[in-house]
């Protein structure tokens, strides 16, 4: 949907392809150093930061009125992807016993994969019915909700170990 938004904001097909290539290059360049940063600051902090970056990117795509701004948020999305994807998996591995790590990560990817279809359908329906801004604002709100759920447990205390 990010690439469709770039197209909607006036980029040509070739420019969208170039933007996606640059996104992937930036992601590849940032993944290793951000993995090291996650080791230093803590996986929980990196996962929380990832939820926040995701929300910021989706707010940006909702409010972007030019392709220039949307491109900036696409490259911020590369930062999110590089920071969150590895840290999220590593954090998951801290939540289960050693003998269950591979199964837990497999289950996580299964659930994410299965839920991507209805999530994408809902996003597309929101876009068609109410416009891109409504769809992206909904995504941002859900990311902020996920961040809040991640940050606190039922007693209002921090829910992750660092």
Go through the PLM ranges and name each one.
Residues 30-43, 127-128:
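Helix-to-loop junctions at the C-terminal end of transmembrane segments
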Residues 1-16:
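Short amphipathic helix-loop junctions that connect adjacent transmembrane helices
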Residues 62-73:
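Helix-loop junctions at membrane interfaces in 12-TM secondary transporters
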Residues 45-60, 140:
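Structural signature of the two symmetry-related core transmembrane helices
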Residues 83-96:
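Intracellular juxtamembrane helix-capping segments at the cytosolic ends
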Residues 24-32, 116-117:
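Residue-level signature of mid-helix packing/kink "hotspots" within the transmembrane helices
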Residues 125-142:
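A membrane-interface helix-boundary motif in multi-pass transporters
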Residues 139-162:
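Multi-pass alpha-helical transporter architecture, strongest
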């Amino acid at each position: 949907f990010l690439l469709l938004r770039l197209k909607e904001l006036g980029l040509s097909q070739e420019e969208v392809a170039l933007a996606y290539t640059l996104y992937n290059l930036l992601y590849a360049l940032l993944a290793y150093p951000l993995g090291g940063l996650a080791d230093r600051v803590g996986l929980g902090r990196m996962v929380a930061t990832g939820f926040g970056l995701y929300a910021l990117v989706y707010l940006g795509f909702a409010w972007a009125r030019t392709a220039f701004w949307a491109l900036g948020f696409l490259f911020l999305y590369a930062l999110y992807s590089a920071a969150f994807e590895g840290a999220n998996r590593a954090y998951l591995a801290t939540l289960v016993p050693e003998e269950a790590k591979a199964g837990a990560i497999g289950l996580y990817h299964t659930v994410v994969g299965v839920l991507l279809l209805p999530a994408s359908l809902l996003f597309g329906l929101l876009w068609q019915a109410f416009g891109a801004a409504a769809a992206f604002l909904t995504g941002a709100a859900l990311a902020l909700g996920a961040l809040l759920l991640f940050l606190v447990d039922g007693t209002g205390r921090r829910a992750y170990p660092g």
